[in-house]
Amino acid sequence: MKQTWRWYGPNDPVTLSDVRQAGATGVVTALHHIPNGEIWSIDEIQKRKAIVEEAGLEWSVVESVPIHEDIKTHTGQYDLWIKNYQQTLSNLAQCGIYTVCYNFMPVLDWTRTDLEYVLPDGSKALRFDQIEFAAFELHILKRPGAEADYTAEEIAQAERRFATMSEEDKARLTRNIIAGLPGAEEGYTLDQFRQHLATYKDIDKAKLREHFAYFLKAIIPVADEVGVRMAVHPDDPPRPILGLPRIVSTIEDMQWMVETVNSMANGFTMCTGSYGVRADNDLVDMIKQFGPRIYFTHLRSTLREENPKTFHEAAHLHGDVDMYEVVKAIVEEEHRRKAEGSDDLIPMRPDHGHQMLDDLKKKTNPGYSAIGRLKGLAEVRGVELAIQRAFFSK
């Protein structure tokens, strides 16, 4: 695997020098300062690429080129935004950047309820609490029809939880859910959030798939022509939330994508922490079935709690993800490619490290502190080395 590291640009508290010292050789970044839908010019791409290369690193993957909400709802200027997206892909290819991670999650990107969940060892992790999320939906957002998405027991627990919350607790929960997490290009006030949710009132899973298919049929041929590989990121969490459909959550969704546009430019990001939240997702089977189309991987683990819809981010080698078997399947795919004459390594980044040690005293991007990811990268690197030596050394 090619070892990479997500970097949020010049304002990231983790520097490129830190990235290089961590042992990564590739950088995963994006032009976050450019508004959603606007073209990434060659000049802007080259400026960022030069910064990365001056640090002795390579810009390996774009994460992400965001998809404008008009495209997801198939309203407004969606065709203009698609044309801009096509041009951005062409510009990236002209600059020698050929792997693009993206997602098709409506309104919100990845979602958590607690950004400072304290683990028994004193480090902090990200957590999604199903009951707190229900309390937000039912008693703060007050989304019409939200009761239908929860069991009677969850509704009762949410009411009890809400009754114990201070105003500060309510504000923090609201902020965590709607203000935008790292990598998300959108942040909302509560009223703006309600308005954006309303734009999806007539969009179910089938309709959102129609809109995604329209996007894929417009984008993938351009990506194919210029040599860019599109790697869709799964929904996080991988199930419907807030009354919104989710359409990249299961192996069936992956198969639908391939059948919709059967081009090798139409590929996947294997995010084990997103897919792995669902107990019915067999990560190794996903890799084996769609290995040739996996162009990027995020390696992390989550741990489901008593309510299986509640989870927190575990250490990289613990939790519900069998990281050994996942890494072994990825390495096997790389060796399959090598046997066919390709030296195409899969870029991997350690995803969402715990906030720990000295980082507990620093201001960090949630999930993206340095030391936790350094630990995760070192652990995964060791797993890969052991697999390479045990199964593939001559």
Curated annotation (Swiss-Prot):
Protein name: Mannonate dehydratase
Pfam families: UxuA (PF03786)
Biochemical pathway: Carbohydrate metabolism; pentose and glucuronate interconversion
Family designation: Belongs to the mannonate dehydratase family.
NCBIfam families in UniProt: PRK03906.1 (NF003027), uxuA (TIGR00695)
E.C. code: 4.2.1.8
Name of the gene: uxuA
Cysteine pairs bridged by disulfides in the record: none
EC top class, as a word: lyase
InterPro entries for this protein: Man_deHydtase, Xyl_isomerase-like_sf
GO biological process: D-glucuronate catabolic process
Cofactor: Fe(2+); Mn(2+)
GO terms, molecular function: ferrous iron binding; manganese ion binding; mannonate dehydratase activity
Catalytic activity: D-mannonate = 2-dehydro-3-deoxy-D-gluconate + H2O
Function: Catalyzes the dehydration of D-mannonate.
Protein's UniProt keywords contain Manganese: yes
Keyword line: Iron, Lyase, Manganese
